[in-house]
From Swiss-Prot:
Swiss-Prot/TrEMBL GO biological process terms: fatty acid biosynthetic process; lipid A biosynthetic process
Protein name: 3-hydroxyacyl-[acyl-carrier-protein] dehydratase FabZ
Major localization listed first in the record, in broad terms: cytoplasm
Cell location: Cytoplasm
Organism: Neisseria meningitidis serogroup B (strain ATCC BAA-335 / MC58)
Known function: Involved in unsaturated fatty acids biosynthesis. Catalyzes the dehydration of short chain beta-hydroxyacyl-ACPs and long chain saturated and unsaturated beta-hydroxyacyl-ACPs.
Catalytic residue positions: H53
Length: 149
């Protein structure tokens, strides 16, 4: 698979199964097979989670930032394997050492930097960092597992 950067949202949907409102990646800006991937998400007030989290003080839920990081990790794995096979999915399989260091609010642009640490028998372990304006917002070790469905 020849990877042309940037990869826009419509093409990300060809790689991972997520769709609105759960697709959390807007663009892939960098990719090195079996090593790293950089993706972005533009956080906007019109996203459904902000209706209740919190109406007077909208803050992006940490679990959605973690989900976005996992989507970036899965995308790195899929691209590294040459693209998505029809019946294969990479599922979020685990998280360690998660740290939340900065709130993310509407108007922010999240930059996800993920690095493949190990890959064995269909399970990848990744170092994942989410940044806003160069500041770390969230960091974690994320595991994704490939499954045939």
């Amino acid at each position: 698979m020849d990877v042309q950067l940037p990869i826009e949202a419509k093409d990300i949907q060809k790689l991972i199964p997520h769709r609105y409102p759960f697709l959390q990646l807007d663009r892939i800006t960098a990719f090195e097979p079996m090593k790293t991937l950089t993706a972005i998400k533009n956080v906007t007030i019109n996203e459904p989670q902000f209706q209740g989290h919190f109406p007077d003080l909208p803050v992006m839920p940490g679990v959605l930032i973690i989900e976005a990081m996992a989507q970036a990790c899965g995308t790195l794995a899929i691209l590294s394997e040459g693209g998505r096979k029809e019946n294969e999915f990479f599922f979020f399989a685990g998280i360690d050492e998660a740290r939340f260091k900065r709130q993310v609010i509407p108007g922010d642009q999240l930059v996800f930097e993920v690095e493949l640490l190990t890959s064995r028998r269909g399970i990848g372990k990744f170092n994942a960092v989410a940044k806003v304006d160069g500041q770390v917002a969230v960091e974690a070790i994320i595991m994704c597992a490939k499954r045939v469905v």
